[in-house]
């Protein structure tokens, strides 16, 4: 397991731990879950239901389920190999071998065009001596490519979610206009029909199952 040899290394580790919330949000499946659920709430037209705590809580739970194999594999490595912060070689070995399952997860869910973009842009933006040293599976490439890929997929799913609800809004709006009820808000009338459609289609089950299965393979 990781050893903390002295106070200085402890301070360094604690400082790095402050980055964990950012990594947990942007470098895991959480980002796609959270964006899709937010788009669903907007499509339904209910800005406060479900509340943020419930929505993000569900995203966290599903992300823990999806990311669990990566965590288990990393834990197995730490149990089988001693990682000391005073030993640079052991730290480098951990980043090379211990994080291999995580890098594999990122690779499996990166769109090819995003990966190619960040590989090519590195050669243009970074100084040559640093760009030449950068490996193709470096986290400097995988993390931004993964995040952009996840956001792209989330918005694609959000677009498909929006379509049936927009149709309901248009139908209700036209009916109200035909009845001369221009002062009545179409959103107020269409909301029950949106909820009914979502419930009849077993929306939560289909959506969550589809999102989880998208990380298969």
Curated annotation (Swiss-Prot):
UniProt topology in membrane: Multi-pass membrane protein
Residues spanning the membrane: 11-31, 53-73, 157-177, 181-201
A Pfam family assignment: FliP
Entries under InterPro entries matching the protein: T3SS_IM_P, T3SS_YscR-like
Keyword terms: Cell membrane, Membrane, Plasmid, Transmembrane, Transmembrane helix, Virulence
Record's GO cellular component terms: plasma membrane
PROSITE patterns membership: FLIP_1 (PS01060), FLIP_2 (PS01061)
Primary localisation category: membrane
Cell compartments where the protein resides: Cell membrane
GO biological process, alphabetically ordered: bacterial-type flagellum assembly; bacterial-type flagellum-dependent swarming motility; protein secretion
Family affiliation: Belongs to the FliP/MopC/SpaP family.
Free-text function comment from the UniProt entry: Component of the yop secretion machinery. May have a role in the negative pathway regulation of yop expression controlled by calcium.
Descriptive protein name: Yop proteins translocation protein R
Organism: Yersinia pestis
Taxon lineage: Bacteria, Pseudomonadati, Pseudomonadota, Gammaproteobacteria, Enterobacterales
Gene responsible for this protein: yscR
